[in-house]
Amino acid sequence: MSVKETLDMRGLRPQKKWGQHFLTDPRILESIADAAEVTPSDIILEIGPGLGHLTRVLAQRAGRVVAVEVDGDLAAKLRDEFAASNVTIVRGDVLRFKPIELLELGAGTSPAPLPFKVVANLPYYITSAILRHILEAVPKPRVVVVMVQREVAQRMTTQPPAMNLLAISVQFFAQARVMRTIAAGAFYPRPKVDSAIVRLDVFERPPLSVEDTARFFEIVRAGFGERRKQLHNSLARGLGCAPEVVATALARARIDATRRAETLTLPEWGALCDALESVTHFSRDESNAELHKTPNLDN
């Protein structure tokens, strides 16, 4: 039975507001499970199970599957279908749950069994937000396999001199690689662009040692805040720093002030973050010292 026939039989329609495009080729479903190297010992968190086609493949291979679906109609159908299985269906927005909370719902116990893997066919419009949510979570998955727009896959895996905020956000936490591309014709309804399967092998520890991850990404966002601008300009404006402070930090990090954000490597961003923190702390300490200096009563 085709995807369209399945939807018609269940009285369902693809919801544009949730960016729903359903895979029609069973071989691709197997490719996704292969990319995640799913085994009977695995706990899988699936995001956006849709009609449950990938869920069935995962359930045949994994020890346990927890699938979170935002569409209430689809979630209800899935609950009926997988009632007596190793699959738990959670109705809700994945961004409103910590991954550990979803796993605990699936396990029926606390704490949830760990480690785990994430498998998802992500809606194009919310890909970045979901990836950030998963990769910044504690605990983190060991592996993330996602179907995304091909252009997004290319942005995630790019290297200097074509870096971008998404690439840094992903590569800070994981090694990313494109496993295969998928033609638009493999989906119903057919999207306007091709897709790709991307595998993220999540680091146990980030390759960069930064004291404050939030501050690190604040600096990176500032660097990319004005496209095609030189770093000394975009950082000064984005961080609200004096130009001389930014210039000093760039010099300490041994980064040419005229370079652009997309040319920096991850280690260079780490060095720049450390340098900016050092310079700004020094500036604050110096200002505080001036404020608290004992006044000269002889004048």
Which residue stretches match the model-derived regions?
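Short helix-coil junctions and helix-kink-helix linkers
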Residues: A236-G238
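Active-site-proximal catalytic alpha-helix in oxidoreductases
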Residues: G225-R228
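Non-catalytic DNA-recognition/assembly elements of restriction-modification systems
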Residues: D274
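Mobile late-domain/C-terminal helix-loop "cap" segments
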Residues: A253-A257
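Catalytic cores of RNA-modifying enzymes
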Residues: M1-A222, T248-R252, E262, A271, ...
